[in-house]
């Protein structure tokens, strides 16, 4: 749900953002964003809508390193753009919102050319490298911050696990990978980011029409959310793709999956860790998380003996029973042989070194619904496990 694209392999911040867009991995690295200014503290509950989507590709809101908004030079507002103002009028009718209010918000939104550059695919292929990507997130600073977060909110995490069946380690892993437990939530104005991508999505992108329509839908959801909350729509800040709060929810995800988990009558993913924890758990439940099922198992594959083409063809979608999986030459041991469900062979490339492999379950696939990337999913899982070990669990 996130859409802050993490930089996977270094280089300059700007280049890193473009590269991570290509690999499709979703996260804000520790050094990539300045601390977020005070966010709106009151968010009214919104009705459910169709599921949120995340920007990116398989392997993936890749995310992408989050650049400094202060380095972005905005152009004039969209008030002078007839196409944007026409869209505002249509949106007001479509969403039953005050037309003058919608026109005012869109008119004050500013185009950010930097964002247009950041969503373009990398100009040349870069080798995916799980070991390098992993090292950005499974590291002492993030593990210590995760242990502190878990310690402070262990009652809420336990409550979420009981209510939704999602382990604390997965919730902690998500929030840790997305925003370093709220330390880096992004500092772009959400209206600027979404308007830029809704009205000026770069046509050089191979999926420009689809992506532009997606962001116009996100702008719809954001305007509805902001208007119902009573907060200043111009005050919301987040990633350059429009993701918000500790869990980096896109507006449609906020509309559909965010919950008031602290019981104060409002949903606040910026300032309420309880709401963030409950919302992440609710998201996974909605995407068919199965309580008690592991996310993956160790697997051994042997070149020349394992039918790699068949096993890798479905990508990360669990497709094979244990019997079918092992009949194709993939070796499982112990509990994996008793797994009651489907499996996928997950390949994690390591640059020029040999790839790593795991047998992903339906719960591994559920993690990729938060961000469509096997690399992202493994980072979330392993960060959560590392924090749990630090906690002595």
Locations of regions flagged by a protein language model:
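Acidic helix-start/capping segments at beta-turn-to-alpha-helix junctions
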Residues: 98-126, 175-179, 189-196, 298-306
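Acidic/His-rich structured neighborhood in mature extracellular/periplasmic domains
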Residues: 127-279, 285
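An acidic, Gly/Ser/Thr/Pro-rich helix-cap/linker signature
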Residues: 36-152, 158-161
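Glycine- and acidic
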Residues: 69-73, 261-265, 362-366
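C-terminal soluble interaction/assembly domains
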Residues: 301-393
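Surface-exposed patches in mature extracellular/periplasmic domains of secreted proteins
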Residues: 97-106, 167-173, 233-238, 264-268, ...
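Ligand-binding pocket segment of bilobal, Venus flytrap-like solute-binding proteins
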Residues: 266-321
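Sec-dependent N-terminal signal peptides
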Residues: 2-34
